[in-house]
């Protein structure tokens, strides 16, 4: 498999899930650094959705990246550690400013 890089949007198999976790085969945005992804065999990612979101930042962020096939929102509260075995092909890439804003949103949610 090609290297999995921070800021990439890739397909991922999120099943099995519990409760209100995002399910299914869906795009995720990779937040973890490249070296972590390569050495750990896992990635830290957040789920994306194409359904318009009522919740605002810091819970969600609309992506402005032009290379996605659909308008998409990052569900910042839906962060997961995933085995690289769950990660599929590349869909697109988030702008570096978007990745930074998502990390800021996550920090706001957890209270740092």
Language model segments and positions:
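Conserved functional hotspots at enzyme active or ligand-binding sites that engage polyanionic ligands
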Residues: 1-112
């Amino acid at each position: 498999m090609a290297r999995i890089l921070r800021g990439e949007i890739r397909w991922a198999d999120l099943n099995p899930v519990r409760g209100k976790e995002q399910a299914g085969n869906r795009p995720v945005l990779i937040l973890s650094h490249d070296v972590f992804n390569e050495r750990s065999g896992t990635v830290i990612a957040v789920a994306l959705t194409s359904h318009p979101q009522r919740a605002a930042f810091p819970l969600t962020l609309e992506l402005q990246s032009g290379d996605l096939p659909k308008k998409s929102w990052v569900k910042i509260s839906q962060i997961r550690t995933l085995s690289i075995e769950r990660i599929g092909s590349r869909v697109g890439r988030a702008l570096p400013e978007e990745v930074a804003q998502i990390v800021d949103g996550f920090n706001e949610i957890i209270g740092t």
